[in-house]
Structures are given as C-alpha cells and as structure tokens.
C-alpha cells in the first residue's frame, strides 16, 4: 500500500500523461528533439506520435521511420515512453492509402434501392452524401438480387426474391458497391474492415515496418500502438415504410457464404426483413442474425487480428472504437463495442469535448475486468478549446479515475 500511495503521489513515466504529439509539417530532427525536451519539462511521461493533416514528410517512408527511431532513442535516454499510432490521421485501417490502392481491400457495402442503376437519373445518384467511411451511393455496383415488395399498413406483408429476368411490381434492388476514393484517404478509400486479409495487409505496411525499425523497444520504451475509430459503412434505415430512397448497410463479397455457413440459411433470400418490420409483432430472426454476424465478422477481421499480432510481438494494442456511447450509435457504426475489446491488450475509449459518457467508460472498464486486463486507455481533453483551464483538465481525469 505504501508503494502504491507513493506511485500515486509521484507517478513514474508509465503512469503520466502521453499526449497526441502532432506531426503535421515537414519534419525536422532539430525541431522534434526540441519538442521532446519541452514535453519532458512539462512533466509528461511520454508522447503518442500522431500524424495530422499537413504532414509533408512521406508517411512511413525511410525519412519518417528514421525520425521515429531517433525519437525512440531520445525517449529511452530521457526515461520516457513513445506510444505508436497506426495511421495517417483516422479512421485506422487504410494505411495512409497504401492498403486501399488495391481494390481487393477497399471498403464495401450493400445498397438497397428502389432505383435500377441502369435507368436512374443523376439527381437520384446524388441523393446520398457523406464521408467515404460512411458510404455513398455511386450507381456502379454489382447486382446481387431483386425483390418484389408488398407493404400493408406500414408492414412488410409479402416479399419474394425475383429470378433473373423475372418481372414484378414495386421492385427493389440490392447492389454491392466499393467505397469511393477521397482526399481524406490520400485519394484512395477506406478499408474493408470485414476482411481479415485487408487487416493483414494493414499490418504489413504499418506494424511490420515499425517492428523492423524500433521493434527491439516493443514492450519497453514502446508499450503500445493506438488504433483509432475503426468502423464499417454506417447502417442506414428508411424513415418510414413507404419511403423511396437508397439505404446502405455494411456488407462484403463473401458475407452471403459465411452467413449461410453460420446460420444454415441465405441472407439475401430474406434481405427485405432487415429494412421493414414484419406484421403481427413477428420478430425477424434474419435481422438479428445479420447484426450478430456482422459484429463477429468485424471483430474477428480487425481487432482480433491486430491484437493477435501485437501479443506475439510484445506490444499492446490500445485505442478506441467509433461511436461508443449508446447501443444505437454502436449498432450503426461498429455493431457493439465490447465484442471488439477482447482483441485489445489495453481497451480504450474516447472522451472528447469534456463530455460525460459514463456508459462509454464503464463498458470498457467492464470488458477489461472480464478479460483480466489491468489497464484502460482514455483519449481525453481533446476538442475543449484554448479556454479549457486546469480545473477542467483535473475534473475530466478525476471522474474517470473515480469510476
């Protein structure tokens, strides 16, 4: 107890703050070394290398990695820690565009629509907008299936999957599309987080390069690597049963195959049940199985794959998922946060804007207890502006520690 109190009063570098250290210009060794001295003088325990918009030194290139090595050597000399960050900005997984240069690894989603893409107008094609990670209809997808839909009093009274060339009324279409390219992803696209092969490619261009450069310090000077806001195409819904609009849901090339193998039935045969309620209070088992299977596909492909690599290389996987606070927000962007935490050696959360997301903190804490982890990372203090004073900083840390 005496040692615990002493550590609490005068924490070692392992238990001091380690801010996101923005690398956002043409990197200079002299400038970086000077900044590490400032961080040490401020009493911080280390720093998290965080690439931001404006970085003018090629990401993960020889010069960049050479500077990382020098920073790690300096931190070791100063008794500080370096925490790696796995991406050029966020969300993690696209490897600064190096992963998604290959179409095989680009994000994918299912577009469910009343509009046939061969005949739809440009206005209809532009109807959905948003970030590339969230998904956007482009009208160039591969046809998966067509359905004849019958609605009664706002419920899905009947539906059937049409055979090739078969006619019908009130036809809806299902297409598989690739995530569009975007300047945010260095003129590439976001990654297919449902594909383990894409995550392995992400490891090749990121984690393996860090291993080659500073791997001897994994588990020592470098305790962990931070993954930030991985997600899939955000799920969309119809505003009302009779609405005629495009709806996007996460999907990938072999989803039908793995769904059939897991549940013994076709997902595409029953796809309309994901979007409309069944009559007479019936519950759609297909809808439940879709959300469950999607959650497992994502967790296995991303966090489990990264965590396994990290564990075998003596470095902890930490970071946080996207949209953590509520069951609704989680369902839309990642299915469920707690299933992903099993892959993290140090589960983490995001607490921006001085918010009080008690559910976010408690679910990560709960997962850590259940898995026998003894730490939880919190990304805090961010997006609080320059007038956020020391009292605010202390309060934000204190209430999380008190939980």
Where are these regions (language model features)?
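Mature extracytoplasmic enzyme cores
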Residues: 1-11, 16, 31-42, 60-288, ...
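Hydrophobic targeting/anchoring helices
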Residues: 14, 91-95, 102, 301, ...
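Glycine- and acidic
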Residues: 16-22, 50-57, 184-196, 283-295, ...
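Hydrophobic faces of well-ordered beta-strands that scaffold small-molecule active sites
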Residues: 17-21, 47-49, 82-85, 223, ...
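Active-site mouth loops of central-metabolism enzymes
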Residues: 18-30, 385-388
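Active-site beta-loop-alpha junctions enriched in small/polar residues
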Residues: 23-26, 52-54, 87-90, 227-232, ...
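Catalytic domains of carbohydrate-active enzymes, especially glycoside hydrolases
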Residues: 31-52, 70-74, 81, 309, ...
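Conserved, well-ordered alpha-helix/loop/beta-strand core segments that scaffold catalytic motifs
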Residues: 207-217, 293-321
């Amino acid at each position: 107890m005496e040692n615990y109190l002493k550590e609490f009063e005068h924490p070692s570098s392992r238990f001091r703050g380690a801010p996101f250290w923005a690398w956002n210009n043409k990197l200079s060794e002299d400038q970086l070394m000077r900044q590490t001295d400032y961080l040490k003088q401020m009493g911080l325990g280390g720093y998290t290398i965080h690439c931001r918009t404006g970085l003018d030194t090629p990401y993960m290139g020889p010069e960049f990695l050479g500077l990382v090595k020098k920073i790690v050597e300096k931190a070791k000399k100063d008794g500080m820690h370096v925490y790696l960050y796995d991406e050029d900005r966020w969300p993690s997984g696209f490897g600064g565009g190096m992963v998604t240069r290959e179409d095989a690894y680009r994000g994918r989603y299912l577009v469910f629509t009343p509009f046939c893409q061969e005949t739809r107008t440009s206005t209809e094609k532009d109807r959905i907008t948003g970030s590339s990670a969230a998904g956007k209809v482009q009208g160039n997808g591969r046809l998966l299936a067509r359905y004849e839909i019958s609605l009664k009093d706002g419920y899905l009274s009947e539906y059937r999957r049409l055979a090739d060339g078969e006619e019908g009324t009130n036809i809806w279409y299902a297409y598989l599309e690739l995530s569009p390219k975007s300047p945010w992803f260095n003129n590439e696209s976001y990654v297919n987080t449902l594909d383990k092969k894409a995550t392995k490619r992400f490891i090749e261009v990121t984690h393996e390069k860090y291993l080659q450069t500073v791997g001897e310090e994994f588990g020592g000077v470098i305790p962990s690597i931070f993954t930030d806001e991985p997600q899939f195409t955000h799920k969309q819904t119809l505003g009302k049963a009779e609405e005629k609009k495009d709806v996007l849901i996460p999907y990938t090339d072999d989803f039908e195959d793995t769904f059939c193998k897991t549940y013994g039935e076709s997902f595409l045969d029953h796809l309309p049940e994901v979007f409309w309620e069944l009559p007479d209070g019936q519950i759609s088992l297909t809808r439940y199985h879709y959300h469950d299977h999607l959650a497992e596909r994502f967790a296995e492909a991303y966090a489990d794959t990264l965590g396994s690599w990290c564990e075998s290389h003596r470095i902890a996987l930490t970071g946080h998922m996207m949209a953590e606070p509520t069951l609704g927000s989680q369902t839309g962007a990642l299915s469920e946060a707690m299933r992903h935490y099993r892959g993290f050696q140090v589960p983490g959360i995001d607490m921006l804007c001085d918010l009080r997301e008690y559910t976010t903190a408690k679910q990560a804490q709960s997962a850590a207890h259940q898995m026998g982890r003894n730490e939880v990372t919190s990304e805090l203090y961010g997006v609080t502006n320059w007038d956020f004073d020391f009292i605010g900083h202390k309060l934000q840390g204190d209430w999380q520690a008190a939980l």
